[in-house]
């Protein structure tokens, strides 16, 4: 029996139903690196997964980076579920609605390769994975399968998926995506964090890491002066204002329509919204793995429909 594994291939992080790790990948060629944490051995080469982040590339299929990160994600998810390292997998992945039709065939072929099973080693454990199927679903909308009640309670709502590089917007009317309203803003968390880092450097001379800035933005523990925290919070509010303004300019009236915010940036916006923004209603899905869970449920639903037909 095959296992369904949902994978959200973000610019900032790779997410499965139970795991999330940075989307960075460092190649060490044929030389084994100093660490086993995140260590992937594939095709006679060594890679460390989860260090830093991917350079922005519009087409994720231009090199093998996201394929290698997919193998790491499968290994992590299998281990988390307590499953054997030799198994068959059905991948449920996603793409933004703005590029869904164009990129879907190529992304499926990229993940579903002819050489099966795929043999590799991750963190010292040997895996033999047969990828039987790759199904691709719209990001954001698939995540709403984890909160079905949201679609039943409102005739219209705005879906805002705040990812690493883009914020993908789409209106949903009577539980059906209004595909002609799909819009993408290049205002994701990478842009937010980079702008804050630069502002902190200008005002204090300090160079903070992504991890430090992310924790401060999320209100999580992180050693740092009050001056730095003030800058981070001020810039977090500035980012939120910019995002709301850009969304309104894209034709979505946030004073009139409820908005569902999800993705890695949703927690930042949730902490920096103000009553003076006058938004109609905001609903936050703060688990950054919600898209991956939604992909799994979508594929399971499709499979049930086929078996019942």
Feature locations, PLM:
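Conserved blade-register residue in beta-propeller folds
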Residues: 16, 169-171
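Nucleotide/phosphate-binding catalytic cleft detector across ATP-hydrolyzing
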Residues: 1-157, 176-191, 203, 210-309
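Ser/Thr-glycine-rich phosphate-binding loops at phosphate-binding pockets of nucleotides
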Residues: 162-168
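A contiguous pocket-lining binding segment that forms or flanks enzyme active sites
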Residues: 199
